[in-house]
Amino acid sequence: MTTVSDFTAHQTATAVVARKGTAGPRPSAVDAPATLTDEHGDVYVEPGLTPLAAREANRSALVGLLDAAGVGHFAVRGTVDHGTVVGVAEEDRERALQAVFRGLGQYPGHLSVVDPDAPRPAKPVSSRDPRAWREVVGARILQVSWYRTDPGRHLLLGHEYGCALEFWRRQGTCLVAPRANRATWAVAVGGPNVMGAARLFSRFVSDWTPGHLAPALPTRPEFLVNCADDIAFPVDAVYTWVDGNDPAWKQRKAQAKGEVYHAESASDARFISRDELRYSIRSLHLFAPWIRNIYVVTDDQVPAWMREDLPGARIATHREIFRNPEDLPTFNSHSIESQLHHIEGLAEHFLYFNDDMFMGRPVAPHSFFTPNGTARYFPSRNRIPQGAVAETDSPVDAACKNNRALLHERFGKVITQPMEHIPYALRRSAMAEAELEFPEAWARTSASRFRAMTDLSPTSSFALYYAALTGRAQPGSMPFTYIQLAVPDLADRLQRLLDGRDQDSFCLNDAFSTPEDTEAQQELLDDFFTSYFPTPSPYER
């Protein structure tokens, strides 16, 4: 019978050997361990790091140790999306623990004993510390992880991305779980392992997530059920983007005819490219790997850094999506947004991003859609100004007032709030239906080459409220931050956002900026973007 003192002595000895470079199965293909601080302990440097990659590397490392020891195991549908869960029979406890000790001896990591009944989780402890092993022998659940960072030491992905080892107790013909999961309390003793789709084991994963980041896992048949809270439908992402420095685009803009009623409507600040799109797509790669396809809508422009030869992201030009070619060229985002539902191949459920919107941490599709497909919208605390459209209204307020008047005429309801600058969850069918139901207003918006007094705001308000009033959308909420780049304390706000990393999404919105302002802002943004989103997406050259 193995004792706590045996485990402690074993771990201390192997940790010393590991410091000398003993060969053995590594937790993943990473560089040599690098300690960020004494508090963090061993941290492994991994190029191309993402939360999903860290999650899979920890799972793969742990099950590799179990496989090497001949310990049978199965993936469990846990209730936490960041990490993974592996179940083993209680009778295999000693062999499983010895395998874990050997692995952590060769490549030190972190572990914690999980008590499902505790009011708060135990803090992870370095496997080099003998205290980490004191309660392991009788533990019902053990969480194991290897901390990871990117080569620039900007990301630190820790214990929450680890793999939990659950010991399932035999009771009659069943193995019984030590805690609740998403599917079942028990599986059959000696039951077969079957392959389960990766999305069953985390809501951060979809059927379109790359297999090397989220492979199918050996599990039990009891976990293959389609739960009521599963989202299996595809979700796409759509961006509108312009390179305001493109000479050809500048010439088209100079030749465009149309009445510009407000100085802000055609200001250069609206068309400045600060490379936000590159980093916004990085945010999807890092924090929303469940997105199926990314569409970038442009006026025959392609970002210089973007690859077009890979599936999963493509350019959709204005010429492809506009139903009335005479509306082109256009320099009005409202006009372009009115045609997004015409993108060929676009999913019924999609998120519309301005290129200044970003995911801030891992987010599940459930934040934007319910499992039955209902979209979520995010009303602002602000209010739409009273009265009819006036010449003094900003383009945003004028469009909100037009939305309000049209929806009130149709539904007898008065909308009072604009939307927060959070990615807009849209239903393609609702937009198509709105275009058919309000053809004159829709066509008028499409034909406005610059923002006009008569515009609707199709994606950021009108289509969301139309979906809500027809039973296809409901209010939601999420932690988010909105930063106006013109604020005097921009540097401090960006630093707080970077230090906290506690927002589901954020928006860095531009104002009417002078060239001097823009230059200073760009320097701050360059540092911020490379620190917050250090890992390139696959779509970068």
UniProtKB/Swiss-Prot annotation:
Keywords: Exopolysaccharide synthesis, Transferase. It comes from the Bacteria. Its EC number is 2.7.-.-. Transmembrane segments: none annotated. PANTHER family: N-ACETYLGLUCOSAMINE-1-PHOSPHOTRANSFERASE SUBUNITS ALPHA_BETA (PTHR24045:SF0), PTHR24045. It is an enzyme of class 2 (transferase). Pfam families: Stealth_CR1, Stealth_CR2, Stealth_CR3, Stealth_CR4. One of its GO terms (biological process) is polysaccharide biosynthetic process. Belongs to the stealth family. This is Exopolysaccharide phosphotransferase SCO6021. Signal peptide: none annotated. InterPro entries: Stealth, Stealth_CR1, Stealth_CR2, Stealth_CR3, Stealth_CR4. GO terms for molecular function: transferase activity, transferring phosphorus-containing groups. The keyword Cytoplasm does not apply. Disulfide bonds: none annotated. Stealth proteins are part of a protein family that is conserved from bacteria to higher eukaryotes. Family members were first identified in microbes as proteins that help pathogens to elude the host innate immune system. Microbial stealth proteins are involved in the biosynthesis of exopolysaccharides. Stealth proteins are predicted to function as hexose-1-phosphoryltransferases. It comes from Streptomyces coelicolor (strain ATCC BAA-471 / A3(2) / M145). The keyword Nucleus does not apply.
